[in-house]
Amino acid sequence: MNDRLFIFDTTLRDGEQSPGASMTKDEKLRIARQLEKLGVDVIEAGFAAASPGDADAIRAIAETVRNSTVCSLARANERDIHAAGGAIKPAKSGRIHTFIATSPIHMEKKLRMQPDQVVEAAVKAVKLAREYTDDVEFSAEDAVRSDMDFLVRIFDEVIKAGAKTINVPDTVGYSIPALWGERMKALIERVPGSDKVIWSTHCHNDLGMAVANSLAAVMNGARQVECTINGLGERAGNASLEEIVMAVRTRRDVFGCDTRIDATQIVPSSKLVSTITGYPVQPNKAIVGANAFAHESGIHQDGVLKHRETYEIMRAEDVGWNANRLTLGKLSGRNAFKTKLAELGIVLDSEEALNAAFARFKDLADKKREIFDEDLQALVSDEGYATEDERFKLLSMKVCSETGEVPRAQLVFTDDGAEKQASGEGSGPVDATFKALESVVHSGADLLLYSVNNITSGTDAQGEVTVRLAQDGRVVNGQGADTDIVVASAKAYLHALNKLHSKRERAHPQV
């Protein structure tokens, strides 16, 4: 059996379906570049038929990425296949991932199609996709609740039609490892021509077993795993890329395969996705959580000090953890700044953008004695928080908060280029800031989440604020970073408002 495990990352498609995690084209490009640096085999860049914006983002990634295959999702219909084919056309290596539901409940209630019609649609889609690329993947949506005989039949037919990868998804996160492994093994044994394709698995985490189910599939013959950075995804999320990769690498004696992932890029990838999407990583998250390599117990600490392998099965530095390394200071020049951005995988598209970023860096260096890698990531992201059709932008603000007095906030911001002033009172400086903004913009949005995370250590560290707003069924995340938490909060709120006013709205299907 092949000892190479292919990593199919769907952070930019399935991961983006997390509430409020929608990304701009530039944000998707930043993540795609990092995924390429990480060494993923396939980047599912989006769902081209969802919107012109999604198709444009996929096309931009296809033009940029050269060491990973760029993929677009497509339902099994002509419109979706044509949209996907056009979007991946510039790619050095492009893939179309087409799918159709195969479970009785989906065929009857959603598709309103007979099994014969479903097979016919799947075969037709694969053949049409082959007109754009030889690399076609087929997924049987809700395979976990599909009849085995029907799965064998439809997989047989799409392989004959030219599919190169067969993906078996647990769309609703219903299976358990023993049963999922058995299903994968049985399909590989029963489907004619199974040795001519790569078998893949795509597991959701509704019962907390996405990684375990994926690994069970690998142990039973799957050689592609579909996953996301930090396990990001709709509902309870997807299988975590970092956990899949390190489980297979650490226990190669069990799995008998490995990936081409550069594990030292795992933590940087995790931090970038967290920053852009506004989804913080829980401290006890395996591999990428802040406590993943922390030892509190005295017995554990003593053992680790004597010999690290007594309590550590992998090294923190192997997955990209390092101390907050001092990188630049207030005396650092423009060339040093540009070089450091390049080392971090940050690409600015013009000299004007570089000059603007350097100006923000010098401003930060005046407020903060030591500048770390994480500060630079946040600095560039803070500017990247501007949406493609930015309406609101903070110019200045003043907050008054005294013991025994009601906090007050005054802000100056632009609204479609026109300068506006706002003032308000609240139970605290952040509450006063948000009420001041609402007194002018009147969005009527509900505040679902407000969170603050320190970017680095120290009392002068930048704070990164995430705000989640809901309006008329839309949910968006806004982010802002600053050494002043209240300023960061105002930036985050305005960023969320900009997203609500943006016309970028997509609906991605489940797989």
From Swiss-Prot:
InterPro entries: 2-IPM_HCS-like, 2-isopropylmalate_synth_dimer, AIPM/Hcit_synth_CS, Aldolase_TIM, LeuA/HCS_post-cat, LeuA_allosteric_dom_sf, LeuA_bact_synth, PYR_CT. Its cofactor is Mn(2+). SUPFAM superfamilies: 2-isopropylmalate synthase LeuA, allosteric (dimerisation) domain (SSF110921), Aldolase (SSF51569). It is found in: Cytoplasm. Residues 5-267 form the Pyruvate carboxyltransferase domain. GO terms for molecular function: 2-isopropylmalate synthase activity; acetyl-CoA C-acetyltransferase activity; manganese ion binding. Pfam families: HCS_D2, HMGL-like, LeuA_dimer. Gene3D superfamilies: 1.10.238.260, 3.30.160.270, Aldolase class I. Its EC number is 2.3.3.13. Mn(2+) binds at residues 14, 202, 204, 238. One of its GO terms (cellular component) is cytosol. Keywords: Amino-acid biosynthesis, Branched-chain amino acid biosynthesis, Cytoplasm, Leucine biosynthesis, Manganese, Metal-binding, Transferase. GO terms for biological process: L-leucine biosynthetic process. Its main location: cytoplasm. Residues 393-511 are annotated as: Regulatory domain. Pathway: Amino-acid biosynthesis; L-leucine biosynthesis; L-leucine from 3-methyl-2-oxobutanoate: step 1/4. NCBIfam families: leuA_bact (TIGR00973), PRK00915.1-3 (NF002086), PRK00915.1-4 (NF002087). Belongs to the alpha-IPM synthase/homocitrate synthase family. LeuA type 1 subfamily. Catalyzes the condensation of the acetyl group of acetyl-CoA with 3-methyl-2-oxobutanoate (2-ketoisovalerate) to form 3-carboxy-3-hydroxy-4-methylpentanoate (2-isopropylmalate). This is 2-isopropylmalate synthase.
